[in-house]
């Protein structure tokens, strides 16, 4: 009984811990003009207003940023899932020269401080005339998330019994058909996770986008939000309102697939 | 035929018309100014129908680094607008053009000399306004007359610092300002007797004047208690706007804000220092337009120059003066009634009289940085004012030397080139069989696998592997401020420097602590919560979704939110500590240990959901029969955890923890955003944030690349070791 009570207390504590910052952002976004500074802990104070949300949509280019972000994240997610699922399948099912080397080098790509790749990125992209174009971002975003996604997918494929494919091979299926008709459908938890990671890496990325996209017509949500923060006078209300709206799609995504998340992230390592 | 010709000509002219010249301007104007800019640009486009102007806002630091990389890549905006102190670095790098060639020498005579600064004898920018200087702004309701000297400042400050309801908390402050930032503190230094920069370039920091200034601020904070213990720009601004501060030190850019908040304010010089009889000298600068060296065509250049002349012309400046109250740089504009009849601008001009021009040489950046580091250490109590002043001089000289260093290729360069050649040849020789096998693989039985992998690996190669090798090359080069355009391989110097610097080892130690503490909490909290959710809680899905939230919110939003929550005065964390736990408030962000702790708390918040999900997955794959059997054998719950859960969870948690450690080790976002790039005094850095600062703030690209290669090697060696020991355990 005592144990049960302790469990409840600690889970409630952590629920507060994980929710509070969000509540705080909500409360800031609801405050009127002057700002995030108040010494009360009220979430919805007497002066609360939805003004910030209204002006976010009417006075800023928020909808444009939203559209750009959706395009970029959509393409990145699609490309990321396609690339990761194919190459991970090869790494899982085939034994060939350099396979271990490849797996290890995928892991090592995570070890280099990513910010230092900025300078070379920029030089390469400007030589290819990909500055101020979504193509540059498509390429960078879908590739940077790849190493983790490939590892993830491979671990999952490893748990799928080979017998499934062998039967189909005997029936005369091509390898490509086996992959698309048998393997992909049973890998949905892992595919969902790969999609999630690809999506997240582009949805909230800021540093690279800031360099690649120079035309405000092409701004993504993080870039747009950042423009509310002048060096010395941040429009906290607008920023908070925008931050909330940026987080909501990811939140919904996470919550709706949290079931897949559990099996997708761990299946491989448990049985593999 | 004629008809077709006509059509052709019309089409051509339409096409020509459709192809308007597009001129880009990057600027860092604050919100109110941006609106005026938009208006005047609209007017310009009306006057010049063949030109469209694209104005892009960038935050000051970002404008600087973004412009640097853009110009280096041969592109970038035609015009760049910013404070005069960016002229020095940009001109040194050779990425902005001397304006004398395009505008003629006499053009500059129409401006206030402050607005047309020269660097190496040439003009690189024209300012559209003069000012940017600090002054004392006072709330007339709380303080009818401003103090004239520092004694009065302290007296009046004491009177205006009030705890209204007697709860031990000050409700109204005598003076507020962003005093941890050297820019806001610099005006006092000359008032105590000595400038902090000599001959425009040399740091002059080891002076009694600097030590006394340190002491003066400390006294205001600790002895007279008229300024808050912790006060950043936002806090000072908010207190003043809420009528909770009698006096404020801020610049001319802030007036609009206070007018809008309906504060009845007056402005005055920062009070004279009574002991010396000298006035604090604010740094007076200009913000202006510079011309990119890279132009797409002569037409672009012509249009950009036209735009530049328009934006600095009298009517445009007057429009700015009228709407946002800036002091025009154009001498004609300054004579107009709009300026003359504006009381604020008049006082402002008077304050500027005791001001000093803002130095624009690149070295200033190193001086500011050293000053900031030492000053914040003094404020945190880890250095005495004297030691702080002494240390600032040493540090500034060191940083200037590093920044200006142009390494010459030494013997190492030849060794290096030889090694590179050998590695490449050796690599080809060693892998020749693999290469052949690889090429043949496209026809062999495994060709399906090859085609499946090819697209992903092309992507990874282009985006990660190639830039990575590029970086290795930079790490052996002299790429820095003075060799921005043409760098060359020089040898091992950066590596030798990195390893012989004691700072490297202390940073490494701190990074290890950061990683271990974070990953420890991530894993233990993750497993703890997973066990509870899995065994005790009803509605598992609900709790799981609830606790996943921190993971779902984009990191940069999280980090800034937590920074606001740690605010000493307004952050909910301190308010809870005081109101409910009756503890004294913690100065989270101005003490090195608490600031580091704040970063860790933020990162723990960010990271535990991932581990929890992984642990949940692991737990759910453990068969229930094991627990039932154990229960039958009479095992306690601890024994069940110790002998069933833990060992079966290990294979899941170890790889996750491994990956988690790598991510944490390289996590720049949290440290950078929560501690505001390493504050206080550069004492919250971990290796990656230190690298970032060296590269993008201090122009030491080569050195930064070398340290990042070292970070990589550390992680690879450690990762290999972990994998190996794990492998051995599994095969036992």
What residue spans do the PLM features occupy?
Chain B
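A structural signal for short loop-to-beta-strand junctions that line the ligand-binding cleft
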Residues: 78, 106-140, 173-174, 276-282, ...
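Hinge/lid segment of periplasmic solute-binding proteins
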Residues: 83-134, 145, 150-156, 170-171, ...
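Glycine-centered hinge/linker elements that transmit conformational signals in sensory
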Residues: 156-158, 200-230
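Conserved C-terminal helix/tail region of periplasmic/extracytoplasmic solute-binding proteins
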Residues: 222, 353-426
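A structural signal for multi-pass alpha-helical bundles of membrane permease subunits
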Residues: 448-732
């Amino acid at each position: 009984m005592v144990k049960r009570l302790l469990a409840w207390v600690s889970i409630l504590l952590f629920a507060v811990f994980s929710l509070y910052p969000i509540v705080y952002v909500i409360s800031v976004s609801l405050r009127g003009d002057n700002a995030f500074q108040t010494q009360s802990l009220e979430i919805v104070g007497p002066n609360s207003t939805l003004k910030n949300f209204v002006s976010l949509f009417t006075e800023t280019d928020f909808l444009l940023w939203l559209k750009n972000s959706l395009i970029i994240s959509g393409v990145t997610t699609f490309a990321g899932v396609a690339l990761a699922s194919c190459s991970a399948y090869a790494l899982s099912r085939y034994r060939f020269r350099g396979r271990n080397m490849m797996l290890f080098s995928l892991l090592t790509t995570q070890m280099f401080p990513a910010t230092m790749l900025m300078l070379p990125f920029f030089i390469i992209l400007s030589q290819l005339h990909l500055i101020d174009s979504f193509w540059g971002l498509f390429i960078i975003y879908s590739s940077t998330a790849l190493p983790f996604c490939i590892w993830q997918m491979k671990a999952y494929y490893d748990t799928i019994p080979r017998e499934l494919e062998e039967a189909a091979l005997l029936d005369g299926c091509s390898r490509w058909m086996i992959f698309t008709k048998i393997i992909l459908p049973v890998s949905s938890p892992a595919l969902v996770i790969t999609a999630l990671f690809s999506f997240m890496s582009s949805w909230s990325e800021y540093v690279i986008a800031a360099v690649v996209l120079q035309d405000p017509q092409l701004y993504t949500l993080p870039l747009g939000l950042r423009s509310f923060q002048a060096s010395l006078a941040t429009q906290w209300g607008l920023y908070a309102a925008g931050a909330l709206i940026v987080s909501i799609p990811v939140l919904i995504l996470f919550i709706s697939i949290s079931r897949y998340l559990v099996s997708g992230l761990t299946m491989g390592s448990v049985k593999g | 035929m004629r008809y077709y010709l006509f059509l052709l000509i019309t089409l051509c002219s339409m096409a020509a018309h459709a192809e308007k010249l597009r001129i880009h301007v990057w600027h860092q104007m604050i919100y109110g100014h941006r609106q005026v800019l938009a208006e005047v640009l609209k007017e310009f486009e009306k006057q010049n129908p063949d030109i469209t102007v694209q104005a892009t806002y960038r935050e000051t630091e970002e404008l600087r680094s973004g412009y640097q990389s853009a110009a280096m890549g041969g592109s970038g905006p035609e015009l760049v607008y910013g404070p005069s102190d960016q002229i020095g670095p940009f001109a040194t790098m050779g990425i902005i053009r001397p304006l004398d060639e395009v505008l003629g020498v006499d053009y500059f005579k129409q401006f206030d000399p402050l607005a047309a600064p020269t660097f190496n004898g040439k003009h690189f920018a024209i300012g559209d306004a003069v000012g940017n200087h600090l002054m004392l702004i006072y709330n007339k309701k709380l303080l009818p007359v401003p103090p004239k000297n520092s004694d009065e400042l302290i007296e009046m400050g004491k009177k205006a610092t009030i705890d209204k309801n007697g709860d031990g908390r000050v409700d109204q402050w005598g003076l507020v300002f962003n005093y941890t930032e050297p820019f806001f503190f610099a005006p006092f230094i000359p008032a105590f007797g000595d400038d902090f920069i000599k001959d425009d370039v040399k740091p002059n920091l080891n002076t009694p004047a600097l030590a006394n200034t340190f002491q003066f601020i400390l006294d205001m904070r600790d002895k007279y208690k008229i300024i808050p213990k912790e006060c950043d720009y936002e806090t000072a601004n908010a207190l003043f706007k809420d009528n909770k501060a009698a006096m404020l030190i801020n610049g001319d850019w802030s007036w609009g804000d206070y007018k809008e908040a309906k504060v009845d304010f007056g402005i005055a010089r920062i009070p004279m220092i009574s002991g010396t009889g000298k006035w604090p000298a604010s740094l007076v600068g200009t913000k202006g337009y510079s011309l990119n060296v890279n132009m797409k065509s002569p037409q672009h250049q012509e249009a950009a120059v036209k735009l530049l002349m328009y934006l600095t012309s009298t009517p445009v400046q007057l429009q700015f003066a009228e709407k946002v109250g800036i002091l025009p740089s154009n001498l004609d504009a300054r004579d107009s009634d709009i300026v003359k009849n504006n009381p604020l601008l008049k006082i402002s001009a008077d304050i500027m009289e005791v001001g000093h021009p803002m130095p624009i040489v690149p070295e200033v950046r190193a001086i500011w940085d050293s000053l900031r580091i030492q000053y914040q250490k003094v404020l945190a109590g880890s250095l005495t004012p004297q030691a702080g002043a002494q240390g600032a001089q040493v540090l500034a000289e060191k940083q200037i030397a590093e920044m200006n260093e142009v390494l010459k290729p030494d013997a190492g360069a030849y060794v290096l080139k030889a090694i590179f050649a050998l590695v490449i040849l050796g690599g080809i020789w060693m892998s020749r069989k693999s290469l052949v096998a690889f090429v043949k693989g496209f026809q062999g039985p495994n060709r399906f696998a090859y085609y499946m992998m090819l697209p992903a690996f092309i992507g990874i190669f282009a985006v990660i592997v190639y830039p990575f090798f590029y970086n290795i090359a930079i790490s052996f080069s002299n790429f820095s401020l003075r060799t921005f355009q043409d760098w060359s391989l020089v040898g091992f110097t950066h590596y030798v420097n990195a390893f012989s610097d004691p700072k490297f080892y202390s940073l490494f130690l701190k990074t290890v602590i950061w990683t271990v503490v974070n990953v420890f909490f991530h894993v233990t909290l993750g497993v703890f919560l997973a066990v509870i959710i899995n065994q005790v809680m009803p509605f598992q899905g609900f709790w799981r979704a609830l606790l996943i939230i921190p993971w779902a919110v984009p990191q940069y939003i999280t980090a800034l939110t937590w920074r606001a929550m740690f605010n000493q005065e307004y952050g909910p964390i301190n308010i809870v500590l005081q109101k409910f736990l009756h503890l004294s408030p913690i100065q989270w962000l101005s003490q090195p240990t608490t600031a580091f702790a704040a970063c860790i708390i933020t990162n723990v918040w960010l990271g535990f959901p991932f581990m929890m999900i992984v642990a949940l997955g692991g737990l759910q794959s453990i068969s229930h029969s094991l627990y039932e059997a154990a229960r039958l054998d009479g095992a306690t719950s601890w024994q069940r955890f110790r002998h069933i859960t833990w060992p079966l969870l290990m294979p899941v948690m170890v790889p996750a923890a491994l990956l988690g450690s790598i991510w944490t080790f390289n996590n720049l976002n949290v440290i950078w955003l929560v501690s505001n790039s390493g504050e206080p005094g550069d004492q919250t850095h971990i290796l990656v944030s230190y690298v970032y600062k060296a590269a993008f703030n201090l122009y030491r690209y080569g050195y930064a690349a070398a340290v990042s290669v070292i970070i990589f090697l550390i992680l690879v060696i450690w990762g290999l070791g972990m994998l190996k020991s794990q492998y051995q355990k599994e095969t036992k």
